Amino acid sequence: TTGSCAAAAAIAAFRKLKNPILEDFNRNIHTVLPSGETIEIPCQSVSGTFSDEKIEVSATVIKDGGDDPDVTSGLPIVTTLTLNLAEAKQANNAPVQTPETWEFVFHGGPGVGTVTLPGLGLEVGGPAINATPRQMIIDNLRNCIRYYYRYLPNAPIHVTISVPGGEEVAARTFNPRLGVVGGIS
């Protein structure tokens, strides 16, 4: 699914985030699905920028629709993780986040639609990233964070999902009639 591709890309991006000098990486990403099943999803690329102000890492997975392809098959699904170091909470001002309490802020990048009507279970004006994929991304990131959170800045992780080509493909879906404009959900 698009959500499992976004989750796999989030895992690959996190690996780069925790190890910036990582040049080669395991391209088969073990991703836990909502059912608890673990699947391997190949990751195409990972890149990152690291500065005193922020850490930003992106990973790309090409969606393979398998036996049940849809209009999104073959599209790149890009997950970008951003830590804005200015948002880091000082130890004396806020409790240190744990894997279970870590804050994630979701954003829709290019090719991800914006919700314009109520009734989808998503915030009107927000990105069309459905609840199940959001939770799958959070659960997989929490699994990653579990081993490294003591070494991360105590700041929210911004998760941006982008789908280059998503805006064009969305025109061939029911999304516009459901109130999702500008991309896929």
Q: Which sequence ranges carry the predicted segments?
A:
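Alpha-helical metal-binding/catalytic segments enriched in His/Glu/Asp
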Residues: 185
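Generic N-terminal targeting/processing segments that precede catalytic cores or assembly contacts
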Residues: 1-182
